[in-house]
């Protein structure tokens, strides 16, 4: 048995490996990028450090650790969970549509971010190779090649599942945060005046004295908080308490390191790659091990983000906002460990494309930030709407204040649009377009299918069944909901007289709870006709065959519908293409191939 202390520290260490990789690797590039925009004098450095500290307090600690993490569904968090909570509290259809669109936008921005984060993290770490003696003149193309090779190995590795190596992520990140803390402390001791930056008046003075230019610096300051949304999104994997406990340690490590980097800038105003230069000046002998540790930390950060993308896509599939895709479960005991091949390879291609396109990490910083601030702003709006409709109304002014600050950061980021920022919108527009076309297409398709109500269907069914030419055994027919009979079933049973001694309509409904499975077998809805209903949470992994066997249903054949869409509408043509390319219901639920019979129905849309 684990002692309480072991599970307490175990939870913290695990959180560091799975949640804090992204925000934990921000010190590699944040101040390096900001200092290209401002003078390295005491007034500017203290102002920027103060902005960084208070950004971490307001946008990560208050918005995510305190406000967002108080809103969970059975321990699950994230944009889709916020949408499910909010929709339950809304009454008008317009408000529901608005909440749905906000969720679509939030998910799309997060997925777009899933391309930029691995690219900037790995590239910025690899750029530290230039400080190794003899490699000072290493061409940028060589660095991109090294970064691309690391990315390729990282994405190929996904198929095996990260279960076995995930246990090493936590300890490596503990070493990383310890190194950041020690390095920062050593530097602060040399110039202790930087500690003044903890006072917010330095941030206010910086914004006041620098006007519009100071406001635009916020677009780079936000880099220190990228990955803050992971606290809430990954809540389902590890639980609220271990993540919040780990955040206190991570927060201290980050603040100490940023202050240390600030102290180093004051002593070395000409320094370029600040974190690497600081560590090299402190312990030149340990620079190469530190560089390897940095690369390991960025790989772990990218890994956590890839797992997060898989998780978001899976939630999107099961809540029907994304098309079905083939999902592999890579862990026998961790529900959250999944692999989606199509998403994995698309991400890899996009990451390498972005690396080649932007060349340097400071160029990539121009595209970074817009998606993050957009996600934070959307989270702020949704939280404010939720708190205003619950008993926690006292949190509304706080959530509103945070949302206004989010909006200020988002506005500051808009000036990045012409300098590469538009790429984060291009990347986000792809999943957004898929979600909008898919959800609207599904609704339009359902209307075009013209299903039959059960009572009308039973009139013909009973006559055919009574003739007695029934096939021995049990036939399963997948339907969307039991009282409604889809055209393919009418085609099979009524027109083709394919009728078994026992026929079972199977329907699967995903509930708005993350975890929960309820089954119900209704016998005798017609002669030799039963209905089997499964209500499952949207994060549940289902073994439908096992559930059927539990209720004594041993099928001989499984029928399912395939829609062949005929349309001249260009949008519905895109929908038809997505539908053809995506996995069908039976592939997604891993039903036995030898028993499957797909029945094609031609549908005009």
From Swiss-Prot:
Q: How does it sit in the membrane?
A: Multi-pass membrane protein
Alphabetic keyword roster? Cell inner membrane, Cell membrane, Ion transport, Membrane, Potassium, Potassium transport, Symport, Transmembrane, Transmembrane helix, Transport
- What catalytic activity does the UniProt entry give for this protein? K(+)(in) + H(+)(in) = K(+)(out) + H(+)(out)
* GO annotation terms (biological process): potassium ion transport
Q: Which GO terms describe its molecular function?
A: potassium ion transmembrane transporter activity; symporter activity
Location comes to:
Cell inner membrane
Query: What GO cellular-component annotations does this UniProt entry give?
Result: membrane; plasma membrane
Where on the tree of life does the source sit, at the highest rank? Bacteria
Sequence intervals crossing the membrane: 17-37, 45-65, 96-116, 139-159, 169-189, 211-231, 246-266, 286-306, 338-358, 367-387, 394-414, 417-437
Its function?
Answer: Transport of potassium into the cell. Likely operates as a K(+):H(+) symporter.
Q: Tell me its family.
A: Belongs to the HAK/KUP transporter (TC 2.A.72) family.
Know the name of this protein? Probable potassium transport system protein Kup 2
* Origin species: Geobacter sulfurreducens (strain ATCC 51573 / DSM 12127 / PCA)
Recite the lineage of the species: Bacteria, Pseudomonadati, Thermodesulfobacteriota, Desulfuromonadia, Geobacterales
